[in-house]
Regions:
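Internal, Lys/Arg-enriched amphipathic helical interaction segments that engage polyanionic partners
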Residues: 39-164, 168-171
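Short, hydrophobic, well-ordered secondary-structure elements
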Residues: 166-170, 174-192
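Generic alpha-helical structural element
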Residues: 2, 22-26, 151, 158, ...
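Short terminal alpha-helical segments
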Residues: 1-47
């Protein structure tokens, strides 16, 4: 799967979150948050005192050992700057999840940051559904005018539509030649 959300966009998102000082983990600690996306018990520790990433990250986040809020973007275990789009989108959506983010002000700031940069790569945030009257966000490809036009053309190329136009032309040839010719011209313009 190719990445449509570029590493430039991802870095811009990380940089603005860092500048804004928004805790992307919300009310969870770093390990609890990341464990919602990755199985930290299966990932290696970068500290020989711990067997797994969960213990490593729990300890280091508890004692404030990470220099930046967005350290996880540059951690090779998560590869957020270069992972596939599906994983990156999951990460973004978890930061907006009501089980994670409890401050409306931070939620609004994150939504604005994500929307601003994702739009450049042709994506947008949207509300997938609600739980307990709270939105669960998703990210989707923005349909451009060309995409919409393509769907419209595909509808006209549907064999049922073409057949209905051909039948109309056949039935009108003897009784209303102008209508038959107009239908033929319309069909040709749509197809070509």
């Amino acid at each position: 799967m190719s990445n449509n959300i570029t590493s430039i966009t991802r870095q811009l998102i990380a940089d603005e979150i860092e500048t804004s000082k928004i805790s992307i983990c919300g009310k969870l600690n770093d390990a609890e948050f990341l464990n919602r996306i990755f199985d930290l018990e299966q990932l290696p520790s970068q500290d020989k005192r711990y067997k797994t990433a969960f213990g490593d990250i729990s300890c280091h986040s508890r004692f404030g050992d990470y220099e930046t809020i967005t350290w996880m973007f540059n951690d090779s275990r998560f590869n957020l700057l270069h992972c596939n789009d599906e994983l990156f989108i999951r990460f973004i959506c978890e930061t907006l999840n009501p089980a994670v983010m409890h401050k409306q002000e931070d939620l609004d700031k994150l939504k604005a940051i994500y929307s601003r940069y994702l739009r450049g790569d042709g994506y947008e945030l949207y509300i997938r559904y609600n739980i307990s009257s709270m939105p669960i966000y998703g990210v989707r490809k923005i349909e451009t005018g060309i995409d919409i036009q393509e769907k419209s053309i595909q509808q006209y190329l549907d064999s049922e539509y073409v057949l209905s136009k051909v039948n109309l032309m056949k039935s009108m040839v003897k009784t209303n030649t102008d209508l038959a010719l107009g239908s033929a011209k319309e069909l040709l313009e749509i197809v070509c």
